[in-house]
């Protein structure tokens, strides 16, 4: 039996490697660039993350509708003072672009069309100490998020075809990565997160990772702040699988 081109045994073996000594897989992401002198200021008013004060050059954030519901959960990459990349699950790039275009008034910034970009995801047992993991030159490297998750992510932003092909060698099946994602409670757009989701439903660790409560105002902030002031006590949707 095969799962998306891989056998069940290959998927299980890949998943066990991700949990153990380490392995890597490849997923496709949508990437939108925001460039220009006002890029950082504009994103600061649109994203839940404090883009200006990011401790590293990458951070997770919500992009919200004015109602406070989720448009996208994405990762921000700061490439330079006037250049940012927004990385989101494949198929959601246009929703991000359309939402950002909506309030782009008298702002010196340009929002690109989404483009498909490979993301190398390396995972290993969190009890292991790893050094010297190489990534292709031209990658934007970030630490992954999620309870019990250890590894690194490399977004192949400006990578040669040869280096990209080399990075894909010996990759575990994408289904192994998906199993890992679900097992660690990491939400994805279109499944756990939809246009009807409010951020609090994603879980407290996602809020802690993606929302700044000390920055200035941003679109959709009111609902997030109100729920936080009430202890973030919101129902969390679950999915029940029946094998009958």
Describe the function of each predicted region.
Residues 1-244:
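Basic, glycine/lysine-rich polyanion-binding surfaces/domains
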């Amino acid at each position: 039996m095969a799962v998306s081109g891989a056998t069940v045994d290959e998927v299980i073996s890949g998943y066990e490697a991700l949990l153990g000594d380490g392995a890597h897989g490849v997923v496709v992401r949508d990437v939108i660039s925001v460039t220009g002198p006002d890029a950082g200021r504009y994103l600061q008013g649109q994203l839940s993350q404090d883009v200006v004060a990011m401790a590293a050059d990458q951070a997770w954030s919500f992009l919200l509708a004015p109602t406070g519901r989720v448009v996208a959960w994405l990762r921000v990459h700061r490439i330079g003072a006037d250049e940012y990349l927004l990385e989101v699950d494949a198929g959601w790039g246009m929703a991000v672009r359309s939402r950002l275009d909506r309030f782009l008034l008298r702002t010196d910034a340009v929002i690109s069309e989404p483009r498909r970009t490979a993301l190398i995801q390396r995972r290993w047992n969190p009890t292991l100490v790893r050094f010297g993991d190489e990534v292709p030159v031209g990658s934007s490297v970030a630490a992954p998020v999620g309870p019990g998750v250890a590894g690194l992510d490399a977004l192949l932003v400006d990578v040669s075809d040869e280096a990209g092909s080399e990075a894909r060698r010996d990759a575990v099946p994408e289904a192994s990565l998906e199993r890992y994602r679900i097992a660690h409670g990491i939400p994805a757009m279109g499944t756990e997160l939809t246009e009807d989701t409010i951020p609090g439903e994603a879980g407290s660790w996602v809020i802690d990772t993606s929302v700044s409560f000390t920055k200035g105002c941003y679109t959709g902030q009111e609902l997030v702040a109100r729920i936080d002031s009430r202890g973030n006590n919101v129902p969390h949707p679950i999915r029940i699988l029946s094998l009958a």
